[in-house]
Regions:
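Zn-dependent metallopeptidase/amidohydrolase metal-coordination segment
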Residues: 1
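Active-site acidic/histidine proton-transfer and metal-coordination neighborhood
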Residues: 6-107, 117, 193-196, 212
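Histidine-acidic metal/acid-base catalytic patches
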Residues: 24-27, 33-35, 88-110, 114-214
C-alpha cells in the first residue's frame, strides 16, 4: 500500500494524528490482504540538523510504527527519496537507518530512479541483505549530477540512462523475490488512460526482466 508519509519530525499533535492514521492504514491493509506498506520519512527537517540526528529520529519513529504494524501483520518499507526537502535521500542513509531499527517487519523500498538520481552506485547494493528489501520500484532516469534530476524526468525503462539491468541483477543477487513494479512520474505518462499505461508498462518491463533473468 502506498504510502504513509511524514512519519518523523512530528510535533505532538501531528504524532497523535499519525498514530490514528497508521492504525487505520494498517487495518485497511489487513482487510485488503496487503502485507506491506510504503513509508516516507519526512519533508519537514529542522534546519541545521545532523545526519546522525536524522538517523536517530527516523529510527525511533519506525520503531514505534513497527510495534503498531506488527499487531496487524504488516511490514513497513522505508523509501529513500532523492528530491529536495527529503530527510532520507540516499540508499546508504536508508540502509543505516534500517540497521539501527533492526526489526523483521521494517525494510527498504528500493526505487531505481531515486537510487540513480541520488548518485548511488550499483556496487552499494551488495551490502544489502535480501530480507531487508521489501519492495522495488522501477523507472529510468537521465544522466544528471546527484540530486539535480527533476521528478518529472522519470521515464519508462529504456528511455533514460540508468543501468537498470545491472541494478536489478544486483537486487536479484540479494535473494529478493518480491514485487517489482513500474513507477513513472513523467507528466505525459500520468496523462495516459489507465489501460494504455498498463500496456506500456508491460511492454517496457517484460523485456527488461527477461534480460535480467538470463
Amino acid at each position: 500500500l502506498n504510502a504513509l508519509e511524514s512519519v518523523s519530525f512530528q510535533a505532538r499533535a501531528g504524532g497523535r494524528m499519525l498514530r490514528e492514521l497508521s492504525d487505520w492504514c494498517f487495518a485497511a491493509c489487513r482487510v485488503l490482504g496487503c502485507g506491506c506498506m510504503e513509508v516516507i520519512a519526512s519533508f519537514h527537517v529542522p534546519e541545521g540538523i545532523s545526519a546522525a540526528a536524522i538517523c536517530r529520529e527516523t529510527a525511533d519513529s519506525l520503531l514505534r510504527l513497527s510495534d503498531a504494524a506488527a499487531d496487524y501483520g504488516v511490514r513497513l518499507a522505508l523509501e529513500f527519496m532523492a528530491v529536495p526537502g527529503s530527510s532520507v535521500r540516499t540508499f546508504a542513509q536508508c540502509a543505516e537507518i534500517l540497521e539501527a531499527v533492526d526489526r523483521a517487519n521494517v525494510g527498504m523500498l528500493f526505487d531505481t530512479w531515486h537510487f540513480c538520481a541520488g548518485g548511488s552506485r550499483p556496487e552499494e547494493l551488495s551490502a544489502l541483505r535480501g530480507d531487508r528489501l521489501f519492495m522495488v520500484h522501477v523507472s529510468d532516469c537521465p544522466a544528471r549530477a546527484p540530486f539535480t534530476a527533476q521528478r518529472a524526468e522519470s521515464y519508462w525503462p529504456g528511455e533514460g540512462d540508468a543501468p537498470l539491468e545491472e541494478l536489478l541483477r544486483s537486487v536479484q543477487a540479494t535473494g529478493y523475490d518480491g514485487p517489482c513494479s513500474v513507477e513513472v512520474m513523467d507528466p505525459n505518462v500520468l496523462a495516459l488512460p489507465a489501460g494504455d499505461a498498463i500496456r506500456r508498462a508491460a511492454e517496457t518491463m517484460k523485456p527488461l526482466l527477461a534480460r535480467v533473468e538470463r
